[in-house]
Each structure stands twice: as C-alpha cells, then as structure tokens.
Swiss-Prot record:
<feature type="transmembrane region" description="Helical">
    <location>
        <begin position="346"/>
        <end position="366"/>
    </location>
</feature>
<keyword id="KW-0444">Lipid biosynthesis</keyword>
<dbReference type="InterPro" id="IPR003342">
    <property type="entry name" value="Glyco_trans_39/83"/>
</dbReference>
<feature type="transmembrane region" description="Helical">
    <location>
        <begin position="315"/>
        <end position="335"/>
    </location>
</feature>
<protein>
    <recommendedName>
        <fullName>Undecaprenyl phosphate-alpha-4-amino-4-deoxy-L-arabinose arabinosyl transferase</fullName>
        <ecNumber>2.4.2.43</ecNumber>
    </recommendedName>
</protein>
<feature type="transmembrane region" description="Helical">
    <location>
        <begin position="263"/>
        <end position="283"/>
    </location>
</feature>
<keyword id="KW-0472">Membrane</keyword>
<dbReference type="GO" id="GO:0000030">
    <property type="term" value="F:mannosyltransferase activity"/>
</dbReference>
<feature type="transmembrane region" description="Helical">
    <location>
        <begin position="406"/>
        <end position="426"/>
    </location>
</feature>
<keyword id="KW-0328">Glycosyltransferase</keyword>
<dbReference type="GO" id="GO:0103015">
    <property type="term" value="F:4-amino-4-deoxy-L-arabinose transferase activity"/>
</dbReference>
<feature type="transmembrane region" description="Helical">
    <location>
        <begin position="7"/>
        <end position="27"/>
    </location>
</feature>
<comment type="function">
    <text>Catalyzes the transfer of the L-Ara4N moiety of the glycolipid undecaprenyl phosphate-alpha-L-Ara4N to lipid A. The modified arabinose is attached to lipid A and is required for resistance to polymyxin and cationic antimicrobial peptides.</text>
</comment>
<dbReference type="GO" id="GO:0009103">
    <property type="term" value="P:lipopolysaccharide biosynthetic process"/>
</dbReference>
<keyword id="KW-0448">Lipopolysaccharide biosynthesis</keyword>
<keyword id="KW-0443">Lipid metabolism</keyword>
<dbReference type="InterPro" id="IPR022839">
    <property type="entry name" value="ArnT_tfrase"/>
</dbReference>
Length: 550
C-alpha cells in the first residue's frame, strides 16, 4: 500500500508541475517561438530532412530535436502545450532513467523514487524542462549514455558488454543529431576518470569500437540525406556552430570561467542545502565505484563547459541527473545520522521565500520604486507572485517540523511557481517577450496583411507561428537568419532600412503592408525614419505600423 501511495503522489506531482499549468504560459521569444515555428513548418511542408525557419534554411542545429517537437505539435496541436510536449516528455524520460539507475546502483526503491523527485523539482531542471528548447533532449541522450556505459562495463558476458556499447553508440548518435558533436565530447570526458580509477581500459578498447560503429550508423542516413540536399550544411554546422561558438575569441555568449557557479547554486534550489554535503560525501566515498562514476558525470561536463568560451545555463542540464542521485543518497544518510544539512536546506528555502516576498513588494506598485515592474491594474499578478514565494517559504518551514521525516516535502517549494508563474508575468514583459500577447491585441490588423515585416527574428517566428504563415520578411536586421538569407532563392526576404521606402512604393498596391518593430520603452516612434503610415498601434515594446493600398 505504501508503494501505491508513493506512485499516486508521484503522478500527482508530475501533473501539477509538468502537465496542468503548461498551457497557461505564453511562448517566450526568441527560443520557444523559434523552435515552435521550425516544427510547424516541418509539419506543414513534410520536409523532415532540412530544417527551415520562416521558409529559410536554418542550419544552427541538426534535425532530431525538431522531429520530437514536430511530433508534439502533431499529437497535441499548435498550442502552448503541443510546443512544449517534446521537452516535457524528454524530461520525464530522464527522470525515469534516474529512477532506474538509482535502483540499480543501491537497490532501494525509496531512494530511487526520491532521486527522481529531487531531479524533477530542481529549479534548473523545471525551468528548462518546461521550456521549448533542445537542451532537455540532449540531456536525455547524455543520461541514457551514462546508463548504457555503466550497463556495458558491469555486464559479465561478451553479449551484455556488446549490447551496452551498441546502445551507448545509439545514444551518442541521437545526441549528435540533436545538438551536434558535443554529444561525443561529454560522454568521453565523463567516463575517462572512472575508467582510469577502476583500471577498465581493456574493456573500453575491446568493445568501444562497437559504440563508434553504432553511432555512425545512427547518424549516417540523415547525415547523407542532408549532405545530398544541402552540401554546405556540415561545413557550416561544424565550423560556425561548434568551433566558433565555443572556442574562438568571438564565441557566442562569452562568459568567464566561474559563470556556472551561480547557475549551480540557483539551479539546485530547493535542494541547495544538500549540494555541498552530497559532493563532499561523494568524494569521501570515492572508493565506491558507483559514486566515482556519478561524480565524474557531474563534474567533468561542468569543467568542460566552464573552459569553453561560449556559455549558457542550459548547457549543464545533464549534470543535474547524477547530482540528484548523489543528493538523494546523501539526504537519506543525513536523515538517519545527522540531519543538520536537511535543517539548513529548510532554512535556505524559508530565506528564499521571504526574500522573494520582500522583493515582490519593492517592485510592486505599492513599493518605493518610481517605475514598478507591475502596474496598479495588475495587482492580481502581484498577489500571484506573493503566493509563489509564500508557498516556497511555507514548505521550507514545514520540512523543519519533523525534519527526519518531512524533508522530502522541499520538493513542493516550487509548487506555487509551477502553478502561478504564467499568471504573474508583468504586462511590460509580456509585451516584449510574448509575441502571442501582441498578436492577440492586434489580430484584426495582422490577419489581412499581404506582407508582414519585422526587425526581430524571435518576433518574426512568433508572428509566423501564431498566424500560421512562414512568409514574414526581415526588416533592417537579419540576426540568426543571415546565413539562410544568403541563398539566391531567399531574395526578397530581407528589406534594409534604406531600401524600405522604394520597396513600399513597389508593393503597396498588392495589399496591406504591416511593419512590426521592437522599440525601447521611452523611444519616440514619431522619430522613426520610415514613410508616414496609415495606422500606428503601440503595445509598449512592440509597434504595429500599417500601410494600406493607395
């Protein structure tokens, strides 16, 4: 009966965090709108080989992540949940692997379940795992690779070892098809310390080639197909998206070496109090083969991405699966022997919740700020934000009431965040970051437009997805579409600021022309260097400018 209660509680937890509230959150630009539109175009065109964005070739990532996203929209429709269904599915599958692997290592069902709950409730896992980007997919393939390699090395027969290494190659191949060659570097770096300490080089050299073969065979069909259709894909993807993005001096998203330290700290909430102890206990217990393995998969990718010049918080998502397992193991030991870390964790959550309540008041209409985040008419959003932090503090307090038994309830600290964050986003943020909000406000003007131009790729993708059309024209800025716009068949998909007046004169009689511009909050739109318009509709950071036939 206790196992049944645990399972019911787990399903209720998943429903409240990962299913019920997802549709209440509008898509964020540029990431979610971009991936939503790429998958919509894939479904509309039936082209499952070459990724396109706004009808243009888009070579920033391989194809597998788009396949999964497309299946999500195919199953659930072109809506917020459909767009995020793929990443949610991948996150839940990763949690299932965490459960299975923990059970295999320690033969403890309660520990395995707690590891999954800790993983799913980690702030960084929840934030990225319900956000339509490709990182939850690559995290799943990396964690699957972690499990496969362990299976291979623990197998006692040549058949078992062969199967494990073949499975490892498939996971690496799917990782390559999701986000590129990092899916090869991370597993190699992660297993080497364990192989060295356990002196298992022989098995690696004898069976490792099976992983190489299965990886190549996994990638080969699509790799050849894309090379035949678009011969320059692999050159662009390897040199620009890998070498330049991560290693060159002009790498994208440059950040210092210590960049991931605050990410680890914030991402470990509401289990931050367990982080130092879990890592320290893992190091103390490094003679235990499984502990060394989990530590290696936690630390080595973190060091690798810290050394790389280009950094984003999403890159280290896979580190949190083995970390959650170490945290769960340490928490059960602490509950039995010395619950100090569990008490500290409770106080950290209380402090975080109280700090959030105070910060919400400071930036509210009733606080001391001259320009509050929320306006007076958004008071219900302020109360939603207060509720988020109040629930966080409450469950932090509850874990202290009988800490040896109640510490797992820290998993409910983000419950308010999961249920209410979609209702607490300020209008000033929505107007700039949620193109759906803009489309809802200007639907009647946008729908009949013959041409729509915009100066933001994220906004363009949001307009295209909401309006179900891929012919949005880039105005003045090319952004990440620069490479796709260089193709001869992309002529006419970009209009510079200097050319706009002439372009307008040539196309005005064909129908309504709509220009959607991103502007600063205090920018005077009357000073924009554009021809006089028939309609100007400003929605804070986005402006709709319309020209009708004359």
């Amino acid at each position: 009966m206790k196992s049944v209660r645990y399972l019911i509680g787990l399903f209720a937890f998943i429903a409240c965090y990962y299913l019920l509230p997802i549709s209440t959150r509008l898509l964020w630009q540029p990431d979610e709108t971009r991936y939503a539109e790429i998958s919509r175009e894939m479904l509309a065109s039936g082209d499952w080989i070459v990724p396109h964005l706004l009808g243009l070739r888009y070579f920033e990532k391989p194809i597998a992540g788009y396949w999964i996203n497309s299946i999500g929209q195919w199953l659930f429709g072109a809506n917020n949940f459909g767009v995020r269904a793929g990443v949610i599915f991948a996150t839940l599958l990763t949690a299932a692997l965490v459960t299975w692997f923990t059970l295999r290592l320690w033969r403890d069902k309660r520990l395995a379940l707690l590891a999954a709950v800790i993983y799913l409730s980690l702030f960084i896992v929840y934030a990225i795992g319900t956000y339509a980007v490709l990182d939850p997919f690559i995290a799943f393939w990396l964690v699957a690779g972690m499990c496969s390699f362990w299976l291979a090395m623990q197998a006692q027969t040549w058949k078992g070892k062969s199967a494990g290494f073949l499975l490892l190659g498939i996971t690496c191949g799917m990782g390559v098809m999701t986000k590129g060659f990092l899916a090869l570097a991370v597993p190699v770096l992660s297993v080497l310390p364990w192989v060295a300490t356990q002196k298992r080089w022989k098995d690696l050299f004898i069976y490792g080639w099976l992983a190489v073969i299965s990886c190549i065979l996994t990638v080969l069909p699509w790799g050849l197909a894309i090379a035949q259709r678009e011969p320059d894909f692999w050159h662009y993807f390897f040199w620009v998206e890998h070498i330049q993005r991560f290693a060159m001096d002009d790498a994208q998203h440059r950040a210092p070496f210590w960049y991931y330290l605050p990410v680890i700290i914030a991402g470990s909430l509401p289990w931050l109090g367990l982080l130092p102890g879990a890592l320290y206990a893992g190091w103390q217990n490094r003679k235990h083969s499984a502990t060394v393995y989990l530590l290696s998969w936690t630390i080595m990718p973190l060091l690798f991405f810290s050394v790389a010049k280009g950094k984003l918080p999403t890159y280290i998502l896979s580190c949190f699966a083995p970390l959650a397992m170490l945290m769960a193991h340490y928490a059960l030991l602490a509950a039995k022997n010395n619950p100090l870390a569990l008490r500290i964790n409770g106080w950290i959550n209380i402090a975080f919740g109280v700090t959030g309540i105070i910060a919400t008041f400071v930036v509210s209409p009733w606080g001391p700020m001259n320009t509050p985040v929320w306006q007076t008419f958004e008071s219900y959003k302020v109360f939603c934000a207060w509720s988020i932090f109040s629930l966080w503090a409450f469950f932090g307090w509850y874990t202290l009431t009988n800490v040896e038994k109640t510490w797992p309830f820290a998993a409910l600290c983000p419950l308010g965040l999961a249920l209410l964050v979609g209702f607490s986003i300020p209008d000033r943020v929505m107007e700039g970051k949620h193109p759906q909000f803009f489309v809802e406000m200007t639907q009647e003007s946008l729908q009949p437009s013959r041409y729509i131009l915009t100066d933001s790729v994220g906004v363009a993708a949001g307009l295209a997805w909401s309006l179900q059309r891929d012919d949005i024209i880039m105005y003045r800025q090319t952004g990440e579409l620069k490479y796709g716009l260089n193709y001869p068949d992309a002529k006419g998909r970009f209009v510079s600021g200097d050319e706009f007046a002439n372009w307008l004169n040539q196309h005005r009689q064909e129908g309504i022309i709509t220009l959607v511009l991103s502007v600063d909050r205090d920018e005077d739109i009357n000073s924009l260097a554009i021809p006089s318009a028939d309609v100007i509709d400003r929605q804070e950071r986005l402006v709709l400018i319309q020209y009708r036939p004359k």
